[in-house]
Amino acid sequence: MQNLGASMDNNKKFKVVIVGGSIAGLTLAHCLSKFGIDYVVLEKRREIAPQEGASVGIMPNGGRVLEQLGLFDDVERAIEPLSVAQLVYPDGFCSESEYPKKLCERFGFPLAFLDRQMLLESLYANLPDITRVKTNSAVIAVEHEDDRVRVLTTDNCSYEGHLVVGADGIHSTIRKEMWRAASSLHQGQVEDTNSMMNITYACVYGISSAHPLLKPGQQITCFNDGWSILSVVGKNGRTFWFLFLKLEREYKYNEAPKYTKEDAIANCDRLSAHTFWDTVTFGDVWSRREVFTMTPLEEGVFEQWSCGRIVCIGDSMHKFAPNIGQGANCAIEDAGELANALARIFNDREKGDGFKPSTPDLSNMLEQFQGKRISRIKALYKVARLAIRLQARDGLAMTLMGRYVMPYLGDKVADWASRDIADGAILEFLPPPERSGSGWQKYSQKSKKSNTPFILAVLAGLGFLLTMFKQQWEYHQDS
């Protein structure tokens, strides 16, 4: 086996092995590069940025970190900033708000949608040294030593480092290796993926070419019974769309349905006559498709993110519905906060070039990192979980709230989104961006109450009304 972490005894620098050339993994690579920490990225695919039909939303909290890293200009050149949000209901009613424009004014960054492939290409191409990224390097095991770890790959190579970061997605190998280590070391509770990740919805996502009646900067959400469509009209009129479908039952992680191209076509054809916007049908958008894919949507947040010299970030630790556009942004934040934690552990010590944190030092640091991230992630997970069910009119309460409350909230939607954005991570070891807005301070919830009580109060009120209605109905039926 070829040892590509060779002569580590002579290598004085602390080294991080990042597994996964994902948005989280490549963002972390940029963060480490800026701070001067050595790293290598291992990616199992042959290429970093394949075209899979996926789009990605960059909210101001993700955009701020990318701006600090000098990467947001690439994003901005590829997007049309969102300016208007439109809600469409099955009874023909429509409502409109300028909350995307308000968010940009408050935070200094637009709501941006672009091809996921474009973002990955930018993250990769702008690395100072792309030779640190190794493709065709699928990880099969992580071995532990007293002061380091060794990562073994299918191409018969091994990579040594002092910290392994799993940024390898929902089907994470590093997560399994972390739990294997936790079990053998009796450190923490080994979590069951099947109990932590559930699947209630599927999604067909795709990109379509321009339609003359759809204007760049539109965000359109179509509410329907048991399904919904979220779409964004981007640069040059290209439409990024997500068709969400409630499944016939809830599945566990290991029961996840497998979908084919034919499944996606059948579902889209079945709903093609439904209104998309104004006189445009979903079929009009679907007929202009460039790429599309169907996938189950996992939902869940893991409790244990680290063990010893292993930590996991991004989709390997949390997965939630795309409806609020925070998935990639949370991955970017994870990378930023992990880099902050590493920067603090190095800055807090009298050190020379040979300083390397001990395993207990790293474990304590990673526990603090996890504690800081998990509370924020859980809050956003709850909002996303509510959003997908609200838009798919999942039950009477969701139907009434979506139709008779959401269109009349005015600036409340922008205020809620602002509170979700304002407490996003910022890189502590780099200057804050010059472009900014007052929203970061105004809407910070670090010393305030969260949005959740208000939302729950609305739902509780609806529940009370429904109970009263049910009682009155039963009374009149009996009389």
From Swiss-Prot:
Keywords: FAD, Flavoprotein, Glycoprotein, Membrane, Monooxygenase, Oxidoreductase, Transmembrane, Transmembrane helix. SUPFAM superfamilies: FAD/NAD(P)-binding domain. Coiled coil: none annotated. The chain crosses the membrane at residues 453-473. It catalyses: verruculide C + AH2 + O2 = verruculide C epoxide + A + H2O. Its EC number is 1.-.-.-. It comes from the Eukaryota. GO terms for biological process: terpenoid biosynthetic process. This is FAD-dependent monooxygenase cdmI. It comes from Talaromyces verruculosus.
